[in-house]
């Protein structure tokens, strides 16, 4: 029989495992693939395979991340797991692996630990919509009361960071025991817990809105003028869909201007529409070449506004990662590389924070010298003389 062509009929969701070091994130990832593999919905990935995460570069920053794929009856998942805590911080801040939801792994033997809190905070800061909890290492706990206590602590922690601590699903099990069942080819009570966890993920983590359905946005990379036709801007559509004759805003640096799209071109062909991911040239009515520049964006009218001041969660690269050798202080003035351009800005550190050392992550305030199209969740790099020294994500617009 001919091999079936891969058909994406199920909705696709990106998730990841988060939690304190050694609480069993990678073991759980292996257990999920193993249990689902027995159900014919995944390929088994063993622990070492996942733990030896390949290096990736995102915005000039090296991150170790493992990606596995699997399916449930209802959905197709891409799952990310990071070996080290610093990799999580970098991953979440750069958005290297966007998460539509997360599985928080907490060892029932330990309860919430410092990185448990930090990963929940980061998830809040970078806009992860929902968290499902897996209480791991249940085979080592025989005290029912202790379990209830740990569950209560985790729920309180979720609520503290504005997740739905009261209603978040909490599943207790043992990733290691489930893996042992998988290896023995005998799915038993521990594997059932993994299936219960995945049923909770299926139900509780919302299906993300597809990029093509979001409000149109395209960062401008280049500007040309075509004699007799007008001005063309080029770039890759970040989200949404653009149609011929749509109105668009040109946002950034100068007061926002609205204009009409009189042509869309891709691979030298005229098109009626283009969507997220496409590299296109867009012809704009009545716009002169010097009225538009790299670093501005084309956007659905009214959907995004220019700002100069915002709060951000930032990771400062270590010296080994090519970052600064020394800390930076209040009033630090680097370039902020936002979408397609560098803009100078100054840094205001929170009260009580004297300086930021290479390798730290910190919440700070940025004031740019020129207004740029920004919103919560916009990612940026921090650069000095073209060299990346940090990464950040906008967490709150101030003005």
UniProtKB/Swiss-Prot annotation:
GO CC, one annotated term: cytosol
Predominant cellular place of this UniProt entry's protein: cytoplasm
Keyword presence, Membrane: no
Region feature (G5): 174-176
Catalytic activity annotation: GTP + H2O = GDP + phosphate + H(+)
Subcellular location: Cytoplasm
Residue ranges of domain tr-type G in the record: 10-209
PROSITE patterns according to UniProt: G_TR_1, G_TR_2
The entry's keywords: Cytoplasm, Elongation factor, GTP-binding, Hydrolase, Magnesium, Metal-binding, Nucleotide-binding, Protein biosynthesis
Protein name: Elongation factor Tu
């Amino acid at each position: 029989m001919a091999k079936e062509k891969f058909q994406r009929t199920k909705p696709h969701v990106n998730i990841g495992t988060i939690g304190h070091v050694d609480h069993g994130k990678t073991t759980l990832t292996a257990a999920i693939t193993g249990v689902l593999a027995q159900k014919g919905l995944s390929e088994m990935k063993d622990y070492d395979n996942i733990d030896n995460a390949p290096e990736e570069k995102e915005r000039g920053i090296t991150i170790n991340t493992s990606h596995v794929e699997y399916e449930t009856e209802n959905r197709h998942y891409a799952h990310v797991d990071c070996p080290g805590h610093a990799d999580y911080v970098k991953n979440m801040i750069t958005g290297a692996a966007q998460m539509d939801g997360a599985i928080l792994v907490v060892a029932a033997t330990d309860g919430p630990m410092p990185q448990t809190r930090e990963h929940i905070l980061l998830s809040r800061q970078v806009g992860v919509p929902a968290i499902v909890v897996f209480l791991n290492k249940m085979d080592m706990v025989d005290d029912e009361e202790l379990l209830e206590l740990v569950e209560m602590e985790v729920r309180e922690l979720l609520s503290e960071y504005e997740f739905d601590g009261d209603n978040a699903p909490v599943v207790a099990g043992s990733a290691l025991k489930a893996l042992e069942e998988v290896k023995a080819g005998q799915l038993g009570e521990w594997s059932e817990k993994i299936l219960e966890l995945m049923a909770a993920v299926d139900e509780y983590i919302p299906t993300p809105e597809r990029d093509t359905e979001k409000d149109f946005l395209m960062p401008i990379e280049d500007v040309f003028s075509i004699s007799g036709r007008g001005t063309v801007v080029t770039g890759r559509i970040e989200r949404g869909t653009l149609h011929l004759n749509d109105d668009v805003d040109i946002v950034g640096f100068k007061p926002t201007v609205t204009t009409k799209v009189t042509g869309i071109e891709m691979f030298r062909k005229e098109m009626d529409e283009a969507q997220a991911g496409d590299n296109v040239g867009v012809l704009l009515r009545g716009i002169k070449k010097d009225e538009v520049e790299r670093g501005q964006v084309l956007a659905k009218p009214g959907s995004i506004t220019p700002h100069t001041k915002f709060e951000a969660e930032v990771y400062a690269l270590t010296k080994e990662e090519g970052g600064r050798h020394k800390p930076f202080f209040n009033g630090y003035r680097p370039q902020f590389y936002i979408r397609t351009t560098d803009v100078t800005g100054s840094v205001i550190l929170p009260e009580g924070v004297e300086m930021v050392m290479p390798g730290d992550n910190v919440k700070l305030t940025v004031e740019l010298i020129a207004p740029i199209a920004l919103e919560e969740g916009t990612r940026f790099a921090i650069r000095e003389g073209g060299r990346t020294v940090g990464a950040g994500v906008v967490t709150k617009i101030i003005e």
